[in-house]
Each structure stands twice: as C-alpha cells, then as structure tokens.
Amino acid sequence: MAEQVKLSVELIACSSFTPPADVEWSTDVEGAEALVEFAGRACYETFDKPNPRTASNAAYLRHIMEVGHTALLEHANATMYIRGISRSATHELVRHRHFSFSQLSQRFVHSGESEVVVPTLIDEDPQLRELFMHAMDESRFAFNELLNALEEKLGDEPNALLRKKQARQAARAVLPNATESRIVVSGNFRTWRHFIGMRASEHADVEIREVAVECLRKLQVAAPTVFGDFEIETLADGSQMATSPYVMDF
C-alpha cells in the first residue's frame, strides 16, 4: 500500500570565508555574508569603510539590495537536500537552470515501494484521499508487473545490473507524478533569491511554494541579512507564501 511522505528540506552546505591576511579589513559577521561584503568592497577598494552609513555588514548588504547590485550575491552559495518532494514538483524546480541538481535515479533505485506526495487539496478530503491512494496502489501494481515481465523478457542479458536498469527505465513510465523524489540543489544566493521570489509567490503551485518557503527559512538562519527582507505570510487556506520589496530587482 502506498504511504504518504511529508516534505523535508535541509541546508547541508553554505559558503565559508577566509579573508586575505594582507588586507586590512574586518567585519562583524563570518561566512557567506562576510564574503559578499568583501567582494563588494574589493570592487571599489573601500576596505577602510569610508561611509559610516555602510560600515556594518548588515548596512552594507542592505545597501546592495537597495541599489540592485545583486551580482555580488553570486559569490556565496548554499546547498539544500530536499526529500518528500514529488516528481512533478522537481520538474518545476529543475527549470531554474542556474541551480545545480543531483536527483534520485528511477533507473538505478527501485521505485516499486517508494512513498507518495499527496496534494493538500486532496489530502484534506477523506473521500478524495482514498481515491488518490487507490490510484497510487494501482499504478504501483502495474509498475511491479511490468518490471517482472520486462526482467523475464530480458533474461538472455548476462549483465544483471544492465538487465534491471533496462527493465526499470521502461517500467517507470507508469509511475505517477506524485512519486516521491529526493534531490540535492546547489546555487548562489542570487539564484536562491530569484527562486524564492518566483516560487514563494501565492500564484505558484502549492507544493513548490512550500518548498520555496522552507528553503527561505533555512537561508534566513544562514544569511539573515541577505534573506531577511522576505516576509512569510499565512494565506486563508492555511498555506504560506513569502514576499520581498526587492522581488522585482532580480
């Protein structure tokens, strides 16, 4: 029987920063946000902080956002490990081509018992949920039947790994879009801001919006100034969205 899985987003990597020993400059933060500030000051040789209004890291980064110099954000990177996301949502995610992706392979990993992501609109209605889970079970049954038949059909192939791969890549055609996937996503801060600005919008699909909001939460901890302009709101249906006054600056 198909089992439901919930979304999980983890920040597994974020840029560190080692300032050059021979540059006389210091700042009040470490890591990715210090790197962004250093890159900006390197453009204009302002390591001595001549403008008191942008002397702190937070003030400097806010100024970057205000004037639209967001190219500096491309020096800092973050990597997320996302689980409990449907294949249909990952198809939307991979359209953001400035990210780098490594996704669970349905050719090498058996999908016959994988979990499913239930859309919220269906999950909140017991009758619709029962119909949905029945459809998942039927598609899983068809997958396993096809897989067994294909492995038998390919029985003359001496390489067992190749035989299984060829069988899975054909049988997976009947797997539903709701099948859970797992994906590692890496991108610079500018790309993450663009993704959140586009996909945390109330006009985005509910699932990809949830992914974007969860990524934002992780990034607001790792880089509170760079992502602090985004505000998370709860909509009438209980789902969440995020907005920023700088969202049109991407």
UniProtKB/Swiss-Prot annotation:
Which superkingdom is the protein from?
A: Bacteria
| Active-site residues from the entry | 199 (involved in ionization of n3 of dump, leading to its activation)
Q: Which PROSITE patterns match?
A: THYX (PS51331)
Q: Which Gene3D superfamilies match?
A: 3.30.70.3180, 6.10.140.450
Q: Which residues form the ThyX domain?
A: 7-233
Q: Which EC number applies? A: 2.1.1.148
Q: Which residues bind dUMP?
A: 92-95, 103-107, 172, 199
Name its pathway.
Answer: Pyrimidine metabolism; dTTP biosynthesis
**Cofactor details (free text):** Binds 4 FAD per tetramer. Each FAD binding site is formed by three monomers.
> Which keywords are on file for this protein?
FAD, Flavoprotein, Methyltransferase, NADP, Nucleotide biosynthesis, Transferase
Cofactor list: FAD
Give a GO molecular function annotation for the protein.
Answer: NADPH binding
Positions that bind FAD: 95-97, 103, 188-190, 194
Catalytic activity entry:
dUMP + (6R)-5,10-methylene-5,6,7,8-tetrahydrofolate + NADPH + H(+) = dTMP + (6S)-5,6,7,8-tetrahydrofolate + NADP(+)
Please provide the Gene Ontology terms (biological process) for this protein: dTMP biosynthetic process; dTTP biosynthetic process; methylation
Q: CDD domains recorded for this chain?
A: ThyX
Residues forming the motif ThyX motif are 95-105
PANTHER family in the record: FLAVIN-DEPENDENT THYMIDYLATE SYNTHASE (PTHR34934:SF1)
Provide the family line: Belongs to the thymidylate synthase ThyX family.
**Subunit description:** Homotetramer.
Entry function = Catalyzes the reductive methylation of 2'-deoxyuridine-5'-monophosphate (dUMP) to 2'-deoxythymidine-5'-monophosphate (dTMP) while utilizing 5,10-methylenetetrahydrofolate (mTHF) as the methyl donor, and NADPH and FADH(2) as the reductant.
Q: What is this protein called?
A: Flavin-dependent thymidylate synthase
Q: Whose protein is this, by species?
A: Corynebacterium glutamicum (strain ATCC 13032 / DSM 20300 / JCM 1318 / BCRC 11384 / CCUG 27702 / LMG 3730 / NBRC 12168 / NCIMB 10025 / NRRL B-2784 / 534)
**Underlying gene:** thyX
